[in-house]
Design a protein with these regions (language model features):
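Extended substrate/RNA-proximal surfaces in nucleic-acid metabolism proteins
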Residues: 46-160
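An N-terminally biased module of ancient metal coordination in phosphate/nucleic-acid-related enzymes
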Residues: 1-65
Length: 160
């Protein structure tokens, strides 16, 4: 599952709550390129008795392909520090890409909205790792588009 720490709609605690209501007994959190939601996920799972598998979805470039690699951890607490450092670098790279995407979109949106898309606002909405759905929500909030689907159709797919 993905949480608000990447491109999901719910917090890690809310995911556990939804799983519990639907009688799910095992759940994994694998946000894109971040471990930020794992502590909350593990704590909430422990409180409900749901078996939790922490993980991460890492985007790996292989030749001209992006591959989404899922990694699961038996013991999150003893994770390799080098992996944590590498994930931090990936987060920083994701932020740079978001800045570039905002610049490209700012150049093609209607004139009255130019300059209104700000990285800080997208980051605040993201609560974690930046992803295109967070930018889409900010575009809806600003009135640039009427829905996140429209943001993707008109801008995010085309100018990514």
């Amino acid at each position: 599952m993905h949480s608000i720490f990447s491109d999901g709609e719910f917090s890690p605690s809310e995911l556990i709550e939804i799983a519990e209501k639907n009688e799910v007994s095992v759940l994994s959190l694998t946000d894109h390129d971040t471990f930020e939601g794992i502590p909350e996920f593990l704590q909430s799972a422990e409180e409900t008795g749901i078996t939790a598998f922490p993980g991460i979805e890492i985007t790996v470039k292989f030749h001209d392909f992006n591959i989404h690699l899922l990694a699961y951890f038996k013991d999150y607490e003893s994770l390799n520090p080098e992996l944590k450092d590498r994930v931090k670098i990936m987060t920083d790279t994701r932020e740079k890409r978001m800045c570039q995407l905002i610049e490209r979109i700012d150049g093609v949106i209607p004139d009255r909205y130019r300059g209104t898309l700000k990285l800080e606002n997208v980051k605040r909405a993201a609560e974690g790792v930046l992803a295109r759905p967070h930018l889409a929500r900010e575009m809806v909030r600003l009135g640039i588009v009427s829905s996140t689907g429209q943001a993707f159709e008109r801008y995010l797919v085309k100018y990514n």
